[in-house]
A protein has these predicted regions:
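Mixed-charge, low-complexity intrinsically disordered regions
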Residues: 1-2, 6-8
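Mixed-charge (Asp/Glu-Lys/Arg
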Residues: 3, 13-14, 18-59, 64-74, ...
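Conserved tryptophan-centered aromatic signature that marks the ligand-binding surface of SH3
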Residues: 89
Length: 206
């Protein structure tokens, strides 16, 4: 079973649209060309370089490694994880449609895949720390390599509600580097919520 991480914008600004539309989008800015037009990942990389003279080859390689799978590797039936930047939860969906390109869509929603969101608002606390590191990968789109453990945690949440993670050690995480800042901020926020309530928390936010 293949599982993908797909973010809803750098700051989670498209999260509600992803959920409400029942879709995931490849939200690369001004990428108004069908991904299936490129015969290889290298062709996509070359396109990024040619479109902007200031784009370095390594940067284009990074972008292509994320964008290419959306149009050419993801498949119907595979699972997508959407980490929320609004709340400390993760949404999970199953891909139900092939890659679609709409040249008339508003930027950056040219590229989409339909999704059945079968598990919304699964608390981060349901997952072991190494899995959370996977969800914190510093990439917009990448593979998640702990599929079985993730699915097991989702099923446990759906059947019994939040429970303590197993604490099993594992070395595989994801195809991307970890967004340490995002994970640290999430941990700090959770600690504050546990320690401070009501108006005291409001004063801290102010």
């Amino acid at each position: 079973m293949t599982m993908w991480l797909c973010r809803a914008g750098r700051f989670g600004e498209y999260e509600n649209k992803f959920i409400e539309d029942g879709c995931i989008y490849c939200t690369w800015d001004n990428l108004d060309v069908a991904l299936t037009n490129f015969k290889s990942r290298q062709d996509l990389q070359d396109y990024f370089v040619s479109k902007n003279d200031e784009t370095k080859v390594k940067t284009a390689m990074n972008w292509a490694s994320q964008v290419w799978p959306f149009g050419n590797e993801m498949a119907v039936g595979e699972i997508v994880a959407l980490p929320s930047k609004i709340n400390s939860v993760i949404h999970f969906g199953r891909i139900t449609g092939e890659y679609e390109f709409n040249a008339d869509a508003p930027n950056p929603f040219y590229h989409r895949r339909s999704i059945d969101w079968f598990a919304l608002n699964v608390p981060r606390s349901c997952f072991d720390q190494d899995i959370l590191y996977s969800f914190g990968a510093f990439m917009t789109i990448c593979r998640i390599k702990q599929e079985k453990r993730v699915v097991k945690a989702i099923e446990a949440f759906q059947n019994h509600g939040p429970s303590a993670p197993s604490g099993d050690d594992a070395h595989e995480s994801s195809d991307g580097a970890i967004d340490i800042e995002a994970e640290a901020l999430s941990a700090i926020a959770q600690r504050m919520i546990q320690k401070v309530k009501g108006h005291d928390l409001a004063r801290i936010v102010d």
